[in-house]
Protein backbone atom coordinates (compact mmCIF):
# COMPACT_ATOMS: atom_id res chain seq x y z
CA UNK A 1 0.00 0.00 0.00
CA UNK A 2 2.77 2.45 0.89
CA UNK A 3 4.52 1.74 -2.40
CA UNK A 4 1.30 2.39 -4.29
CA UNK A 5 0.74 5.65 -2.41
CA UNK A 6 4.20 6.81 -3.52
CA UNK A 7 3.00 6.66 -7.12
CA UNK A 8 -0.04 8.85 -6.45
CA UNK A 9 0.40 12.62 -6.47
CA UNK A 10 -2.80 13.29 -4.52
CA UNK A 11 -1.95 11.06 -1.52
CA UNK A 12 0.80 11.17 1.07
CA UNK A 13 1.57 8.45 3.60
CA UNK A 14 2.18 10.14 6.94
CA UNK A 15 2.08 7.39 9.51
CA UNK A 16 1.79 3.80 10.49
CA UNK A 17 -0.64 2.27 12.96
CA UNK A 18 -0.90 -1.11 14.61
CA UNK A 19 -3.26 -2.98 16.89
CA UNK A 20 -1.94 -6.25 18.24
CA UNK A 21 -4.68 -7.36 20.58
CA UNK A 22 -6.68 -6.63 23.66
CA UNK A 23 -6.35 -7.32 27.38
CA UNK A 24 -2.62 -8.03 27.10
CA UNK A 25 -0.94 -8.75 30.43
CA UNK A 26 2.71 -8.78 29.39
CA UNK A 27 4.98 -6.21 27.72
CA UNK A 28 6.58 -8.84 25.44
CA UNK A 29 3.93 -8.62 22.67
CA UNK A 30 4.23 -4.82 22.64
CA UNK A 31 8.01 -5.01 22.37
CA UNK A 32 7.83 -7.57 19.57
CA UNK A 33 5.25 -5.52 17.65
CA UNK A 34 7.33 -2.36 18.01
CA UNK A 35 10.41 -4.16 16.64
CA UNK A 36 8.41 -5.19 13.58
CA UNK A 37 6.84 -1.77 13.01
CA UNK A 38 10.19 0.03 13.39
CA UNK A 39 11.76 -2.38 10.88
CA UNK A 40 8.95 -1.55 8.47
CA UNK A 41 9.47 2.19 9.02
CA UNK A 42 13.17 1.72 8.22
CA UNK A 43 12.35 -0.27 5.07
CA UNK A 44 9.88 2.40 3.93
CA UNK A 45 12.44 5.15 4.56
CA UNK A 46 14.97 3.24 2.44
CA UNK A 47 12.37 3.21 -0.34
CA UNK A 48 11.69 6.94 -0.06
CA UNK A 49 8.66 7.07 2.24
CA UNK A 50 9.30 9.08 5.39
CA UNK A 51 6.62 8.81 8.04
CA UNK A 52 5.88 11.42 10.69
CA UNK A 53 3.86 9.42 13.20
CA UNK A 54 3.42 6.01 14.71
CA UNK A 55 0.25 4.85 16.44
CA UNK A 56 1.21 2.01 18.76
CA UNK A 57 -2.43 1.12 19.35
CA UNK A 58 -3.73 -0.11 22.64
CA UNK A 59 -4.32 -3.47 24.18
CA UNK A 60 -2.96 -2.83 27.66
CA UNK A 61 -4.97 -5.02 30.00
CA UNK A 62 -6.70 -4.36 33.30
CA UNK A 63 -7.32 -6.48 36.37
CA UNK A 64 -10.81 -7.99 36.22
CA UNK A 65 -10.06 -10.86 38.57
CA UNK A 66 -6.48 -12.05 39.05
CA UNK A 67 -4.69 -10.66 35.99
CA UNK A 68 -1.49 -8.69 36.53
CA UNK A 69 -1.12 -6.39 33.54
CA UNK A 70 1.90 -4.11 33.26
CA UNK A 71 1.60 -0.67 34.78
CA UNK A 72 1.63 2.31 32.42
CA UNK A 73 5.20 3.02 33.60
CA UNK A 74 6.31 -0.54 32.74
CA UNK A 75 4.60 -0.25 29.36
CA UNK A 76 6.31 3.09 28.65
CA UNK A 77 9.72 1.77 29.78
CA UNK A 78 9.58 -0.89 27.06
CA UNK A 79 8.52 1.43 24.24
CA UNK A 80 9.79 4.96 24.84
CA UNK A 81 13.56 4.37 24.74
CA UNK A 82 13.26 3.00 21.18
CA UNK A 83 10.82 5.68 20.06
CA UNK A 84 12.54 8.81 21.42
CA UNK A 85 15.39 8.80 18.92
CA UNK A 86 13.01 8.43 15.96
CA UNK A 87 11.54 11.93 16.08
CA UNK A 88 8.08 10.54 15.35
CA UNK A 89 4.87 11.76 16.88
CA UNK A 90 3.65 8.88 19.02
CA UNK A 91 -0.04 8.13 19.41
CA UNK A 92 -1.61 5.45 21.53
CA UNK A 93 -5.14 4.22 22.16
CA UNK A 94 -5.37 3.24 25.82
CA UNK A 95 -9.06 2.31 25.57
CA UNK A 96 -9.83 -0.39 28.11
CA UNK A 97 -6.88 0.60 30.30
CA UNK A 98 -8.57 3.89 31.16
CA UNK A 99 -12.24 3.08 30.53
CA UNK A 100 -12.82 -0.33 32.15
CA UNK A 101 -12.61 0.74 35.77
CA UNK A 102 -14.48 3.99 35.06
CA UNK A 103 -17.83 2.25 34.62
CA UNK A 104 -20.15 0.11 36.69
CA UNK A 105 -23.24 -1.63 35.33
CA UNK A 106 -26.05 -1.48 37.88
CA UNK A 107 -28.71 -4.13 37.51
CA UNK A 108 -31.66 -5.33 39.55
CA UNK A 109 -32.47 -8.92 40.46
CA UNK A 110 -35.91 -9.49 38.95
CA UNK A 111 -36.39 -12.91 40.49
CA UNK A 112 -34.54 -15.96 41.76
CA UNK A 113 -35.07 -19.26 40.00
CA UNK A 114 -33.90 -22.30 41.99
CA UNK A 115 -33.69 -25.66 40.28
CA UNK A 116 -32.52 -29.06 41.40
CA UNK A 117 -29.16 -28.57 39.66
CA UNK A 118 -28.51 -24.85 39.61
CA UNK A 119 -29.77 -21.54 41.00
CA UNK A 120 -30.35 -18.59 38.70
CA UNK A 121 -30.61 -14.90 39.53
CA UNK A 122 -32.49 -13.31 36.64
CA UNK A 123 -31.52 -9.65 36.29
CA UNK A 124 -32.77 -6.75 34.20
CA UNK A 125 -29.45 -6.35 32.35
CA UNK A 126 -28.39 -8.68 29.59
CA UNK A 127 -25.63 -9.70 27.21
CA UNK A 128 -26.59 -6.76 24.99
CA UNK A 129 -25.59 -4.45 27.87
CA UNK A 130 -22.25 -6.16 28.51
CA UNK A 131 -21.12 -8.64 25.86
CA UNK A 132 -17.78 -9.79 27.34
CA UNK A 133 -19.09 -12.67 29.52
CA UNK A 134 -21.39 -14.11 26.84
CA UNK A 135 -18.93 -13.65 23.99
CA UNK A 136 -15.87 -15.24 25.55
CA UNK A 137 -16.71 -16.23 29.12
CA UNK A 138 -14.92 -13.21 30.55
CA UNK A 139 -15.02 -12.80 34.32
CA UNK A 140 -16.76 -9.70 35.62
CA UNK A 141 -16.91 -9.01 39.35
CA UNK A 142 -20.54 -8.87 40.51
CA UNK A 143 -21.28 -7.55 43.99
CA UNK A 144 -24.46 -6.61 45.84
CA UNK A 145 -24.83 -2.84 46.21
CA UNK A 146 -26.18 -3.44 49.72
CA UNK A 147 -24.79 -6.69 51.13
CA UNK A 148 -27.29 -8.92 52.92
CA UNK A 149 -26.75 -10.26 56.43
CA UNK A 150 -26.11 -13.91 57.18
CA UNK A 151 -29.85 -14.28 57.75
CA UNK A 152 -30.10 -14.56 53.96
CA UNK A 153 -28.58 -17.87 52.86
CA UNK A 154 -25.68 -17.81 50.43
CA UNK A 155 -26.30 -19.71 47.21
CA UNK A 156 -24.25 -20.38 44.12
CA UNK A 157 -25.97 -18.48 41.31
CA UNK A 158 -25.62 -18.01 37.61
CA UNK A 159 -26.40 -14.34 36.98
CA UNK A 160 -28.50 -14.35 33.81
CA UNK A 161 -30.34 -11.79 31.73
CA UNK A 162 -33.85 -11.74 30.29
CA UNK A 163 -32.83 -12.28 26.66
CA UNK A 164 -34.17 -15.56 25.32
CA UNK A 165 -30.70 -16.93 24.56
CA UNK A 166 -28.72 -19.60 26.40
CA UNK A 167 -25.60 -17.42 26.33
CA UNK A 168 -27.27 -14.52 28.15
CA UNK A 169 -25.27 -14.42 31.35
CA UNK A 170 -23.04 -11.93 33.13
CA UNK A 171 -21.58 -14.36 35.63
CA UNK A 172 -21.62 -18.04 36.49
CA UNK A 173 -21.18 -19.87 39.79
CA UNK A 174 -21.25 -16.82 42.06
CA UNK A 175 -21.72 -17.30 45.79
CA UNK A 176 -24.08 -14.49 46.77
CA UNK A 177 -26.77 -13.67 49.34
CA UNK A 178 -29.66 -12.38 47.24
CA UNK A 179 -33.37 -11.66 47.26
CA UNK A 180 -35.53 -10.40 44.40
CA UNK A 181 -35.21 -6.64 44.08
CA UNK A 182 -31.54 -6.45 45.10
CA UNK A 183 -29.26 -4.16 43.13
CA UNK A 184 -26.04 -5.68 41.81
CA UNK A 185 -22.97 -3.81 40.61
CA UNK A 186 -20.99 -5.33 37.76
CA UNK A 187 -17.64 -3.62 38.17
CA UNK A 188 -15.05 -2.94 35.49
CA UNK A 189 -17.82 -2.49 32.91
CA UNK A 190 -16.64 0.83 31.47
CA UNK A 191 -15.06 -0.85 28.46
CA UNK A 192 -17.32 -2.81 26.14
CA UNK A 193 -20.35 -2.17 28.35
CA UNK A 194 -23.47 -0.05 27.95
CA UNK A 195 -22.98 1.97 31.12
Predicted regions, residues:
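Active-site loop/helix belt of alpha/beta enzymes
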Residues: 1-112, 170, 174-176
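Charged (often Lys/Glu-rich) extended helix/loop segments that serve as interaction or gating elements
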Residues: 78, 87-195
Amino acid sequence: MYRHIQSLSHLEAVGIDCHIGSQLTSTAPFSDALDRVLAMIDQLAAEGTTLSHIDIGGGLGVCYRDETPPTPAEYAAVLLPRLKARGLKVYMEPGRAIAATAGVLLTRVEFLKPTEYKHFAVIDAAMNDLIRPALYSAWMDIVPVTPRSEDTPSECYDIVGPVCETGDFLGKNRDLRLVAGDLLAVTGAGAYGFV
